Design a protein with these regions (language model features):
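Flavin (FAD/FMN) cofactor-binding and adjacent substrate-gating region
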Residues: 1-35, 42-44, 48, 60-62, ...
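Short beta-strand segments that buttress and anchor functional surface loops
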Residues: 21-22, 67-71
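C-terminal catalytic lobe of FAD-dependent flavoproteins
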Residues: 39, 101-153, 158-300
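Short, surface-exposed charged micro-motifs
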Residues: 46, 55, 81, 141-143, ...
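Conserved SAM/SAH-binding loop
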Residues: 50-54, 71-73
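Short, hydrophobic/aromatic-rich segments at coil-to-beta transitions
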Residues: 63-67, 127-128
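Core beta-strand elements of the Rossmann-like FAD/NAD(P) dinucleotide-binding domain
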Residues: 73-84, 88
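Flavin (primarily FAD) binding-site architecture
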Residues: 87-103, 297
């Protein structure tokens, strides 16, 4: 406790038991996207902007072979044909799947909204990024991050069904974060007047209840019997004693036992999903920024 307060002297000592130190990384998300686009171009990819997908195209056998698109600057519509069509549109994944008239689409996405607030570092001077429980009995963890003379803190985690292009920071988001940060740093006394900027983003989470920390039905725990059944069926599959369908049946049964209740947003898995439809449309969704290269390699 004493060492934690030496590192973070403004931290509230009440109920503080201790802390830990871990390594983390930071990145510029917009720059990361641009660098990936540049590298794809270097490797022969054709980059287009302001072009919107409208329909999924199929060949005479019903297999996906391209996309009909519209240039939003000129209004021109045209077809783009390809051997593979991969849907990597994040929160919009279900919308793209619905463009495929050969699919019966069951929604798989559960987008949640995350909000950060920004104050001047003179108002909240944290020496290094700090990660702590929100203190609001919701299972959330919150960051306070110093960067370039400012301090960011967040994030929230709430279900979102609004405009995906323009998620808004609501008063409830601000109130939640101000209460959380002032509970942990009471001497700072941060108010709405200290907030210089804010932003909201969407997490493209998978709706299925597959996370290890799921808090819904069956107390969110996989029973020992179910765990043994999964291990046994996978072992038999590796020995070629059962089919892939047998493995899927066991996993589907396990999922159904965990889906009695809808988990809260923070309990939804941050894992990824790779789906190949019968007509060949590939959808890669979910995941985290730290996994994006692994996800891409797995899809290819």
């Amino acid at each position: 406790k004493e060492e934690v307060l030496q590192r973070e002297p403004q931290l509230n000592p009440d109920k503080l038991m201790g802390g830990g130190v871990y390594l983390d990384y930071r990145n510029n998300d917009a720059r990361l996207v641009i660098e990936n686009i540049k590298k794809a171009h270097e490797n022969g990819g054709l980059m287009v902007s302001h072009v919107k997908a409208q329909h999924i195209l199929h060949d005479e056998n019903g297999n996906v072979n391209g996309v009909n698109v519209k240039d939003l600057l000129t209004g021109e519509e045209f077809d783009i044909h390809a051997r593979l069509v991969i849907n990597t549109t994040g929160p919009w994944s279900d919308f793209i799947r619905e463009m495929d008239d050969q699919l019966e689409v069951t929604p798989q996405m559960r987008p949640t909204k995350g909000v950060h607030l920004v104050v001047d570092r003179s108002r909240l001077n944290v020496p290094q990024p700090t990660y702590f429980d929100s203190g609001q009995q919701d299972g959330r963890m919150v960051f306070a991050i110093p960067r370039e003379g400012k301090t960011y803190f967040g994030t929230t985690d709430t279900d979102y069904q609004g405009d995906f292009l323009h998620p808004r920071v609501e008063q409830a988001d601000v109130d939640y974060l101000l209460k959380t940060i002032n509970d942990r740093y009471p001497e700072a006394e941060i108010t709405i007047d200290d907030v210089e900027a804010s932003w909201a983003g969407l997490r493209p989470l998978i709706a299925s209840n597959g996370s290890s920390d799921y808090s819904g039905g069956n107390s969110g725990k996989i029973t020992a019997q179910s765990f043994d059944e999964v291990i046994a069926i996978v072992d038999k599959y590796e020995k070629q004693l059962v089919s892939r369908e047998d493995v899927e049946d066991v996993l589907n049964h396990l999922e159904s036992t965990l889906s009695e209740n809808k988990p809260n947003p923070s309990a939804v898995s941050r894992g990824s999903s790779l789906d190949v439809a019968q007509d060949g449309l590939i959808t890669l969704a979910g995941g985290k920024i730290t996994d994006y290269r692994k996800m891409a390699a797995g899809a290819i």
